[in-house]
Regions:
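Long, contiguous N-terminal structural blocks used for assembly/anchoring
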Residues: 1-81
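Amphipathic protein-protein interaction modules
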Residues: 61-137
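Non-transmembrane, interaction-prone alpha-helical and coil segments associated with secretion
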Residues: 141-142
Length: 142
């Protein structure tokens, strides 16, 4: 395998993991709010969920497109982070003031300050609505 093919394969795997962990973070944070409107499942309730569990084919394609575009636009900075962390940070940054500030790109010290700001701002480009699990499938508005 030549270097270019290996690089493409590596980033393809990164995108898949990024998408899975971003979805897990979204479900952990957003789904099944309690009676006070506080969102979130226990992590154990959502850690098994994958992108394949997104019920609607178009929504699944759009989710992957969003993740792919974000990763491809920010490879230089994301190369400093494992896909798991980057996916989780992406979702919280994406939520902006409705996310958990301590779990966003803005505060991750593994990144230079300029990269933290750039990734945090870039995360808000794609609108995603409410996320929930029903009948073992993921549903959300894209």
């Amino acid at each position: 395998m030549d270097e270019q093919s290996q690089d493409a394969s590596t980033w393809s795997a990164y995108i898949d993991e990024f998408a899975r962990w971003a979805l897990g973070e979204a479900l952990w944070w957003e789904s099944n709010p309690d009676e006070n409107g506080v969102g979130g499942d226990e992590w154990e309730a959502v850690e098994h969920v994958t992108v394949a569990d997104i019920a609607d084919d178009r929504a699944r394609e759009r989710w992957m497109q969003m993740c792919r575009e974000f990763v491809e636009m920010n490879k230089e900075h994301l190369a400093l982070l494992p896909a798991e962390s980057a996916g989780q940070l992406f979702w919280q940054s994406k939520r902006g003031r409705w996310g958990v500030p301590g779990r966003s790109f803005r505060v991750d010290k593994r990144l230079p300050k300029r990269a933290r700001r750039a990734l945090h701002r870039a995360s808000s480009r794609w609108p995603v609505g409410y996320v929930f699990i029903r009948d073992e499938k993921v549903h959300f508005e894209l």
